[in-house]
C-alpha cells in the first residue's frame, strides 16, 4: 500500500508543494476549528487565528499554481546537488549519553558485536563534548557547528536578570496581541509568537540550500520546528499539553502527602467499586474565568471493557479500556473542550497501581496528540500526522520518559523501564521509516533511552552509591536491574546492527553510504550534590533575609542588597551585577573581574571533607569558555565537577540547604554535568576518521564537506579528515 511519504527521495523536488496540499486536506478534514494551546511552562495561548483555514486554502492553491515551475527548478538543482559529494547518503545515529568506558567494556566482553564490527570497519574514537556537557547545549553545538557563545544555549534554564527567576532557555512565548470578544468568549485574531532562542543555522539547512534532502528525527533543541528541505520531528523542549516539560498525575484515596516534584497528587473517593475524577488540561483562554479544561473519567473496579479479564474498567469520553495492575494502557486520546466548538486533543497512558487497600492510579504527562497536534511539532506539520497514521500514536513530549515519577517513588523500576523501551521502539519505527525514504541525503536520529536509563539505573552499578538499594533497604536482595544498563547497551548494539544491515548491507557496504554512531557526552555517577548557594553564604558572597524561610525556592530568601553572586540551574554561577540584575551591587569592569577571579581561586579544587575527594576540578570564566555575540547571556562562572559530583538538586531551583555537600539518594543517580574533559562521547564510523581529537561540533562541518558543500565561516567546528572515495 502506498502512502503520501512513501517516495520522499524520488519526489524531493516537489515535496514542499505536496506537503502544503496534504496539510490543507488534513486541516479541512478535521471536523473542528483549527485552534490550539501552547506554552512551555509560561501559560497557554491560542495558537492560530480565525482565518487559518482560509489562509491555508490560499497557500495550497498557490502551491498548485507554482508547482510546475518549482518542479523544474528543483529537478535541475537536484541533479547538481551531488556533483561534488563524496557520499550519497550520510546516516548519523545519536545514542544520547553513551559512555565510552562502558562501550569499550562490553565490546571487550563480546556483548556488542555490531559496534565492534563498525569500529573495525572504519573507526572508533572518543568524541569531545562541550562546556557544560548538558544535552541541550551539546546537541545545539552539534546541529549548528558553533560554540555556545554563538548558539545561546547554556543550560535547560536561564536566569531572568530582572526577577532572578528561571526561564526555559530554548523557547519564549508571547500570547496573541489582538483578540475579539464575543459574549463570554475571547478569540485571537493573530497568532502567538513562539520563538526559538537557540541561534545559529542547523547544518542540514545549509545542505538544503544546496539541494540535499534531510530527515531529522527527534534531535534535541529543534522545537519549534524550522523549515528545511526535508522533514523534522521535534524533540527536547516540546511541552506537554499543559505547557510544562512533563507533569504526571497520581490519583489516590490516600490523604495528600508532601508536594510532588514533577507532578501532582489528586485525592479521590471510592464509592463502592467506582472512582470518579478528571484529567486536568490546559488553561481555557477562550472562556472567561473558566480555569483549566477538564476531561472526566470513571474507573469501575472489578469490571472489564472487553471479554478478557481485567482489574478495572476505565471510561473516558465515549471509550472504555481495560486496566490491569502494573500494566500500561496504550496511548489514549483525550479531548478537552474549551467551548464555542473549540477543542484540543492530547494523548496519555494510564497504569493502575493498586486497588486495595488504597486505590492508586498513575497517568503519564499528557502529550500533544501527533495525529492532531495542538501546535506544530514537525516540519511539515503533516509529518507528525503521517507517522501517527502509519504507526499509531507516539510520545511527543521532549523529555518523554517520566523520570520524576520514579524519583518520587510513584512508579517502580520496572514501570519506568517499560516506558523507556516502549518509546525507543516508537523511535525505531520512525528512524527506519526515515531511512527508507532518504535514499540520498542526510538522515539523523537521536535515541534518548541511553540517557534516561543511565540517569535512573546507575545506582545499581556501584554498591557504594548512596542510592544503591542495599544502602536504603536493609532487606534488599540482588535484583535483575543490576544488569539493566548492560542490557541497554546490548539492545542499542542490536539497533546498530539492524541499521548496518539496512544501510551498509551484510558486508562492508559500497562506500556510498556512511554511518556514524555518536553520543553527545558520556556518563558518570552522581553520588554527592553541592549546594553552591550555601558555599557562597559560607564564603561571604551571599546573604539571606532575616525572615528567610528554609524551604523557599527560586532564591526568594536572598537579600540582594548584600549578595554578590548566586547560583541557579545546572551550569554555574551568576554575578549580581549592577545595571544588569535588577538589584545588582557589583560594579561592571574591574570589580567584576576581581570578584570572578577570587571565586575561581577559592572554588577550584574544592574538597569534600566526608570523602576526601576533589569535588570541583575547575571553575571557568565565561570570557574564557565562550566566544560569540551571545556570550553575555551565559552564566558568569561555569563549574567543572569531578566524577561523582554535581550541582545539588535544590541549587538547581534556587532553594538553599543547611550544608554544602549532601548524599544523592534519588533514583536519578547518574549524570554528565561535570568537567567536559572527563566525559567525552563516542564516535563509531563506517569510514576511517583520520583526524585526532574529533569534537561534537565538528560533525556538522564534516557532513557539509562530505556532500561537497562549503563550510560557513562562522562555524567553529572543522571538517574531519574522512577516508572515503568518490560517491
Residue ranges of predicted features:
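Short amphipathic alpha-helices and their capping/turn segments at secondary-structure boundaries
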Residues: 370, 374-384, 429-444
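Active-site His/acidic residue clusters
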Residues: 225-229, 437-494, 498, 575-590
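Low-complexity, glycine/alanine/valine/leucine- and proline-rich hydrophobic stretches
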Residues: 645-691
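N-terminal secretory/membrane targeting signals
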Residues: 1-36
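Membrane-spanning helices that line or support transport/gating and their immediate boundary helices
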Residues: 60, 64-75
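N-terminal signal-anchor transmembrane helix
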Residues: 72-88
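Hydrophobic alpha-helical membrane-interaction elements
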Residues: 35-61
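Secreted, luminal/periplasmic, and some membrane-associated catalytic domains
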Residues: 86-88, 101-104, 109-110, 120, ...
Amino acid at each position: 500500500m502506498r502512502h503520501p511519504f512513501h517516495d520522499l527521495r524520488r519526489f524531493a523536488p516537489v515535496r514542499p508543494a505536496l506537503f502544503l496540499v496534504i496539510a490543507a486536506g488534513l486541516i479541512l478534514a478535521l471536523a473542528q476549528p483549527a485552534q490550539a494551546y501552547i506554552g512551555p511552562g509560561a501559560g497557554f495561548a491560542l495558537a492560530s487565528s480565525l482565518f487559518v483555514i482560509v489562509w491555508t486554502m490560499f497557500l495550497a492553491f498557490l502551491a498548485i499554481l507554482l508547482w510546475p515551475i518549482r518542479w523544474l527548478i528543483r529537478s535541475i538543482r537536484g541533479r547538481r546537488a551531488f556533483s561534488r559529494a563524496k557520499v550519497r547518503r550520510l546516516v548519523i545515529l545519536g545514542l544520547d549519553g553513551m559512555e565510552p568506558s562502558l562501550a569499550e567494556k562490553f565490546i571487550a566482553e563480546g556483548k556488542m558485536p555490531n559496534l565492534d564490527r563498525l569500529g573495525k570497519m572504519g573507526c572508533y574514537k572518543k568524541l569531545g563534548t562541550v562546556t557544560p556537557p548538558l544535552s541541550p547545549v551539546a546537541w545545539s553545538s552539534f546541529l549548528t557547528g558553533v560554540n555556545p557563545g554563538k548558539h545561546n544555549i547554556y543550560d535547560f534554564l536561564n536566569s531572568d536578570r530582572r526577577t532572578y527567576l528561571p526561564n526555559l532557555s530554548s523557547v519564549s512565548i508571547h500570547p496573541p496581541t489582538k483578540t475579539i470578544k464575543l459574549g463570554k468568549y475571547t478569540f485571537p485574531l493573530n497568532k502567538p509568537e513562539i520563538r526559538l532562542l537557540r541561534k545559529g543555522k542547523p547544518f542540514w539547512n545549509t545542505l538544503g540550500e544546496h539541494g540535499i534532502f534531510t530527515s531529522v528525527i527527534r534531535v534535541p533543541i529543534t522545537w519549534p520546528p524550522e523549515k528545511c528541505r526535508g522533514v523534522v520531528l521535534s524533540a527536547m523542549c516540546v511541552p506537554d499539553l499543559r505547557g510544562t516539560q512533563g507533569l504526571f498525575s497520581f490519583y489516590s484515596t490516600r490523604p495528600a502527602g508532601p508536594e510532588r516534584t514533577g507532578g501532582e497528587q489528586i485525592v479521590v473517593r471510592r464509592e463502592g467499586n467506582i472512582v470518579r475524577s478528571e484529567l486536568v488540561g490546559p488553561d481555557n483562554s477562550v472562556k472567561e474565568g473558566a480555569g483549566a479544561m477538564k476531561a472526566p473519567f470513571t474507573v469501575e473496579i472489578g469490571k472489564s471493557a472487553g471479554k478478557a479479564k481485567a482489574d478495572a474498567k476505565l471510561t473516558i469520553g465515549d471509550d472504555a479500556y481495560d486496566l490491569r495492575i502494573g500494566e500500561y494502557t496504550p496511548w489514549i486520546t483525550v479531548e478537552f473542550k474549551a467551548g464555542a466548538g473549540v477543542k484540543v486533543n492530547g494523548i496519555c497512558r494510564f497504569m493502575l497501581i493498586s486497588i486495595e487497600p488504597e486505590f492508586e492510579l498513575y497517568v503519564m504527562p499528557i502529550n500533544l496528540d501527533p495525529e492532531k497536534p495542538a501546535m506544530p511539532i514537525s516540519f511539515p506539520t503533516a509529518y507528525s500526522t503521517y507517522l501517527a497514521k502509519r504507526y499509531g500514536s507516539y510520545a511527543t513530549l521532549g523529555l518523554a520518559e517520566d523520570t520524576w515519577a520514579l524519583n518520587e517513588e510513584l512508579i517502580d523500576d520496572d514501570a519506568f523501564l517499560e516506558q523507556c523501551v516502549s518509546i525507543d521502539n516508537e523511535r525505531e519505527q520512525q528512524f527506519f521509516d526515515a531511512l527508507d525514504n532518504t535514499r540520498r541525503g542526510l538522515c539523523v536520529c537521536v535515541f534518548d533511552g541511553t540517557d534516561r536509563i543511565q540517569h535512573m539505573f546507575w545506582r545499581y552499578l556501584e554498591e557504594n552509591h548512596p542510592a544503591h538499594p542495599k544502602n536504603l533497604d536493609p532487606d534488599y536482595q540482588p535484583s535483575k536491574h543490576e544488569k539493566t544498563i548492560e542490557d541497554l547497551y546490548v539492545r542499542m548494539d542490536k539497533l546498530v546492527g539492524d541499521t548496518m544491515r539496512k544501510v551498509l548491507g551484510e558486508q562492508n557496504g559500497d562506500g556510498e553510504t556512511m554511518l556514524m554512531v555518536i553520543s553527545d557526552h558520556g556518563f558518570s555517577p552522581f553520588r554527592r550534590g553541592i549546594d553552591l548557594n550555601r558555599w557562597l553564604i559560607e564564603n561571604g558572597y551571599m546573604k539571606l533575609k532575616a525572615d528567610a524561610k528554609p524551604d523557599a525556592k527560586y532564591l526568594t530568601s536572598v537579600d540582594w542588597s548584600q549578595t554578590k553572586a548566586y547560583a541557579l540551574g545546572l551550569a554555574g554561577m551568576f554575578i549580581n551585577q549592577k545595571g544588569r540584575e535588577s538589584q545588582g551591587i557589583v560594579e561592571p569592569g574591574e570589580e567584576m573581574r576581581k570578584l570572578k577571579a577570587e571565586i575561581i581561586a577559592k572554588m577550584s579544587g574544592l574538597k569534600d571533607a566526608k570523602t576526601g575527594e576533589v569535588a570541583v576540578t575547575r571553575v571557568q570564566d565565561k570570557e574564557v569558555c565562550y566566544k560569540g555575540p551571545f556570550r553575555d547571556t551565559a552564566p558568569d562562572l561555569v563549574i567543572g565537577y569531578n566524577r561523582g559530583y554535581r550541582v545539588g538538586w535544590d541549587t538547581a531551583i534556587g532553594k538553599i540547604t543547611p550544608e554544602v555537600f549532601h548524599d544523592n539518594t534519588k533514583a536519578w543517580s547518574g549524570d554528565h554535568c561535570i568537567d567536559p574533559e572527563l566525559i567525552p562521547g563516542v564516535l563509531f564510523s563506517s569510514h576511517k576518521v583520520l583526524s585526532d581529537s574529533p569534537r561534537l561540533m565538528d560533525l556538522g562541518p564534516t557532513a557539509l564537506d562530505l556532500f561537497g558543500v562549503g563550510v560557513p565561516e562562522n562555524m567553529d567546528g572543522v571538517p574531519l579528515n574522512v577516508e572515503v572515495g568518490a560517491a
